[in-house]
């Protein structure tokens, strides 16, 4: 960003509204990619600036006329510069992200929460769940956002939050503590199902790595800040999904279901396994590539994934 823009911003912008407007203009001029919780420059600016000032996202309109100190303007401008020059997602600049209306701590050890599964959680997985879940597994938990959101949606359920990454589990543990969920959400290190005891769950939810090699090679620069372990999944993006499909039935109750996100790799799933009765879920708020299978359906297609049993 040109030095003149920085000097003008610090010296001439006075109110919160001024700073938001300036940031939106700079973001539009920089042609940024939006895909980490927002889809436009205005929301991106708001979610950068308000947390930087230790303010809630939903401030009353009259607060927008508040004057900013010189140090506050400088701190905002520094983060705007990082967002533009380094293409750093704003969640990593503020260490804040939102999922299912809940706030989470995030840093570059975990992906920024953005899964459409949040819409399913808010609807309590209806009409797919037959019974109120007693035990839930969040497989590949990352920041723990899905596990914690499930715990809020089902306050009587125990939730196991599984991840292979000790770094990710440290972030998940922090979020579990921040939400006061230590007695309901339990972080566990495991390579998918490999290191888990054979216990039964009414619901397994998974947002595993699913980006195929072609997409990995063409991701916008913003995604380079995220851990590759949480994104890349082989040539067709199904490296981990096949293992999940091979093993999930052994961990589900009779009426249990698997909800799994595969994003753009949905195309590979449909081409390679067109005989499997995936229920591809639809979303009102955007998103795609999430399927549901019952335990019995997983049992019926077990032979397709026999090579991937842990």
Swiss-Prot record:
Its EC number is 2.1.1.298. One of its GO terms (cellular component) is cytosol. Belongs to the protein N5-glutamine methyltransferase family. PrmB subfamily. HAMAP family: L3_methyltr_PrmB. It comes from the Bacteria. InterPro entries: DNA_methylase_N6_adenine_CS (IPR002052), HemK-like (IPR004556), RF_methyltr_PrmC (IPR019874), Ribosome_uL3_MTase (IPR017127), SAM-dependent_MTases_sf (IPR029063), Small_mtfrase_dom (IPR007848). Methylates large ribosomal subunit protein uL3 on a specific glutamine residue. Keywords: Methyltransferase, S-adenosyl-L-methionine, Transferase. CDD domains: AdoMet_MTases. GO terms for molecular function: nucleic acid binding; protein-glutamine N-methyltransferase activity. This is Ribosomal protein uL3 glutamine methyltransferase. PANTHER family: 50S RIBOSOMAL PROTEIN L3 GLUTAMINE METHYLTRANSFERASE, RIBOSOMAL PROTEIN UL3 GLUTAMINE METHYLTRANSFERASE. GO terms for biological process: methylation. The keyword Flavoprotein does not apply. It catalyses: L-glutaminyl-[ribosomal protein uL3] + S-adenosyl-L-methionine = N(5)-methyl-L-glutaminyl-[ribosomal protein uL3] + S-adenosyl-L-homocysteine + H(+). Pfam families: MTS (PF05175). The lineage of its organism: Bacteria, Pseudomonadati, Pseudomonadota, Gammaproteobacteria, Vibrionales.
């Amino acid at each position: 960003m040109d030095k003149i823009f920085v000097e003008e911003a610090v010296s001439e912008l006075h109110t919160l509204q001024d700073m938001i407007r300036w940031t939106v203009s700079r973001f539009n001029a920089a042609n940024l990619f939006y895909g980490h919780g927002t889809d436009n420059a205005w929301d991106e600016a708001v979610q950068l600036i308000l947390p930087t000032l230790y303010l809630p996202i939903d401030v009353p309109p009259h607060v927008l006329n508040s004057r900013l100190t010189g140090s506050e303007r400088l701190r905002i401008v520094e983060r705007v510069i990082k967002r533009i020059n380094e293409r750093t997602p704003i969640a990593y600049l503020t260490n804040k992200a939102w999922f299912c209306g809940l706030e989470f701590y995030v840093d570059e050890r975990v992906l920024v929460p953005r899964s459409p599964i949040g819409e399913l959680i808010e609807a309590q997985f209806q009409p797919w769940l037959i019974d109120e879940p007693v035990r839930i597994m969040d497989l590949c938990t990352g920041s723990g956002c899905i596990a914690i959101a499930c715990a809020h949606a089902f306050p009587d359920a125990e939730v196991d939050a599984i991840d292979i990454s000790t770094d990710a589990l440290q972030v998940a543990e922090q979020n579990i503590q921040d939400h006061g969920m230590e007695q309901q959400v339990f972080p566990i290190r495991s390579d998918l199902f490999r290191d888990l005891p054979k216990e039964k769950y009414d619901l397994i939810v998974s947002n595993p790595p699913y980006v195929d090699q072609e997409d990995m090679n063409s991701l916008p620069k913003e995604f380079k800040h995220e851990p590759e372990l949480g994104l890349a999944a082989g040539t067709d993006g199904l490296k981990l999904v096949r293992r999940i499909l091979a093993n999930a039935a052994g961990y589900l109750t009779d009426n249990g279901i698997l909800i799994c996100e595969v994003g753009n790799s949905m195309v590979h799933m449909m081409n390679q396994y067109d005989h499997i009765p995936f229920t591809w879920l639809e979303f009102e708020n955007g998103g795609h590539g999430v399927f549901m299978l019952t335990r019995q359906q997983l049992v019926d297609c077990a032979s397709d994934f026999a090579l991937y049993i842990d």
